[in-house]
Amino acid sequence: MAKKTSLFECQHCGFTSPKWLGKCVQCNAWESFIELNQTQKEVLNALKKPLPQVQKSVSIAEIEHEEVIKFSSTQSELDIVLGGGIAKGGLYLVGGSPGVGKSTLLLKVASGLAKNQQKVLYVSGEESLSQIKMRATRLDCIEEELYLLNEINWPVIKANMESENYFACVIDSIQTLYSPEISSAPGSISQVREITFELMRLAKTRDIAIFIIGHITKEGSIAGPRVLEHMVDSVLYFEGDPSRELRILRSFKNRFGPTSEIGLFEMKEQGLVSAKEASSLFFSKEEPMEGSAITITLEGSRALILEIQALVSECSFGAPKRLANGFDTNRLNMLIALLEKKLEIPLNRHDVFINVSGGIKISEPACDLAVIASILSSFKNRKIDNKTAFLGEVSLNGRILEAPNLNARLKEMENYGFLKAILPKKPSQKTSIKCYEANVVGKIVEWM
């Protein structure tokens, strides 16, 4: 009798081994090997066999250029993030924490497309049809061309998508679907990977724009194999505190446009709506307080006015704390060391806390000057005029470097009635903002 052979596969990188391994030798993942059944082994072996006919390569100069056809998602902020709209045949992955509004946003998108007489399918494995209908009624999303399907069996969903000429499809969520051909539970890495691959083929062969909702892990990444993010055309993350109105949509991958844009939404009674006057959500118009400084950051092509808040308090014992919300803690430590060295401010005996209002995360160094100004304001208990903004990157030798795309930042200040700007060099274009030059960090003390 022939001995039964086993084959184990890593669920992260696909590495195969004839025996179970605790740690993958290729990607170093722990406890990631599962045993393949006979059908899966046959498929894997078939893929490794040489093809009977090899496709001939084509010169890139001979290939006809085809423009990517895009259409509006009916949500202006989502169109900005996607680079002008939804691409036909695009596969989009949307992740975010529970309750942030992923299903609400895509239900609004599906309803908007259906309102334009486009047939849209919304597949839900988490909610019943009556629950979706109740939510759609509350959001005013009832449309004749919006079709609902409550199903988790992938072959049934696939047959439904192939039987009708759908313009777009929403899968809510990928972790609830399962295929009987794969001997693992719904939401497992094998199930998610194989079903996503099938969705990718459907999107490309039938020109259907497909949105996939994905759960996230406790670390904040989308649950499932890393290959999932490589298979899709765009990866979008929905951020925001469910207890607050503001939501931020970020693009971390986009084959059809830039990845630096963000979309701003507000959770209202009628659901998620595109935010108007976005900058007003991130700074206070009240009387100035100690520890607050204004700056302007660029998110893609959009300039946003932000309020940096600092709290400096005397440390009673132990090592002082340095905590930052929305700002890089390592960069904060660097700026504190710079203040101690250049301005001889004894922050080594003080706790320093930084917060960026509105819950947005700063990724560019052009906000360094505002962080330093807010720390000095809190340390000296002096208020800074809330019509003054600080713009500039601070180097390790104490010099202040010019912020890129300065004219766009000053234009945003003009729109909201700001009067003064502290920066290393005056702008090349005329502006109503009164600009004061400060090329070294020591000159900031003059404004305290």
UniProtKB/Swiss-Prot annotation:
A motif (RadA KNRFG motif) lies at residues 253-257. Its EC number is 3.6.4.-. It holds the Pfam family Zn_ribbon_LapB. It comes from the Bacteria. ATP binds at residues 96-103. It is an enzyme of class 3 (hydrolase). InterPro entries: AAA+_ATPase (IPR003593), DNA_repair_RadA (IPR004504), P-loop_NTPase (IPR027417), RecA_ATP-bd (IPR020588), Ribosomal_Su5_D2-typ_SF (IPR020568), Ribsml_uS5_D2-typ_fold_subgr (IPR014721), Rubredoxin_2 (IPR041166). The keyword Metal-binding applies. One of its GO terms (biological process) is recombinational repair. A zinc finger (C4-type) spans 10-27. Keywords: ATP-binding, DNA damage, DNA repair, DNA-binding, Hydrolase, Metal-binding, Nucleotide-binding, Stress response, Zinc, Zinc-finger. The keyword Ribosomal protein does not apply. Residues 351-448 are annotated as: Lon-protease-like. One of its GO terms (molecular function) is ATP binding. One of its GO terms (cellular component) is cytosol. DNA-dependent ATPase involved in processing of recombination intermediates, plays a role in repairing DNA breaks. Stimulates the branch migration of RecA-mediated strand transfer reactions, allowing the 3' invading strand to extend heteroduplex DNA faster. Binds ssDNA in the presence of ADP but not other nucleotides, has ATPase activity that is stimulated by ssDNA and various branched DNA structures, but inhibited by SSB. Does not have RecA's homology-searching function. Belongs to the RecA family. RadA subfamily. Has a putative N-terminal zinc-finger, a middle region with homology to RecA with ATPase motifs including the RadA KNRFG motif, while the C-terminus is homologous to Lon protease. This is DNA repair protein RadA. It comes from Helicobacter pylori (strain J99 / ATCC 700824) (Campylobacter pylori J99).
